[in-house]
């Protein structure tokens, strides 16, 4: 939701769509109004890149990049691009060589920047989903090299980049994946910066309840949906749950996924346990939703690990079973 909102605020594809933000705090400042719809934006997600081999993973990433190029085929019109650049543009496909694929986002940035006369914003959602699958399925080293090459080209050696936002759900030492991105700022759930930006605050939720004539249900909503802490900011609510509650005006589990619980006997050593933990995180299996669906508490395991590169720091890790 956050990435979609950022795209719609900045993207030239949503120019003259300021009404989407009318009535919101950001629209009270003219300097922010003047930014709406003024940047070329490259938005992509790796959320569905869940392959079992290196070859199919790269092919899926190439497919996503190909769709980006197809969405911007207007760049081929006229004389903006040289014949060599047009040839490169047309070479983008699911089966393109890796050396072409790793430069594709960088070069699309250049083409868009030339067309609009402005640097681009890149939004990459769930950058780490392919890496989780690579670790679980044994092709981490291969994918790490490919990913580092692509990210270095897109996010470091890219003079056409205004700024970028990448989101992920696993905490990995920056030097393991982004050793070349020394200008990267890592924001986690323990960071104070932006602590109120990735969820609804209690004040916002209660104001919404009052606006919808549901102020008498504040305690009920708090007991169900007040479950997140970012930095030192407590009482952060899941936006999707609150939006659905306001729409349906009744309590319900609006944020969950189908879950398969792995038997503890299937975990023969620490490596199996770590893999199970990563799979659980990737599938968004949360304790509250598992209990809600009737899974016995004794079948649910809570994982806590600290990672340094590809090594697990045993002393800082706990496994509660």
Pin down the residues of each PLM region.
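Metal-dependent nuclease catalytic cores in nucleic-acid-processing enzymes
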Residues: 150-157, 280-302
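Active-site proximal loops enriched in glycine and acidic residues that flank catalytic Cys/His/Asp
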Residues: 168, 268, 304-306
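Mg2+/Mn2+-dependent nuclease catalytic core
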Residues: 136, 141-146, 266-286
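Residue-level signal for secondary-structure boundary sites
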Residues: 52, 175, 267, 292, ...
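Phosphate-binding site recognition
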Residues: 1-265
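A short, hydrophobic secondary-structure junction motif
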Residues: 33, 45, 280-286, 307-314
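Domain-level recognition of nuclease-like catalytic cores that cleave nucleotide substrates
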Residues: 289-321
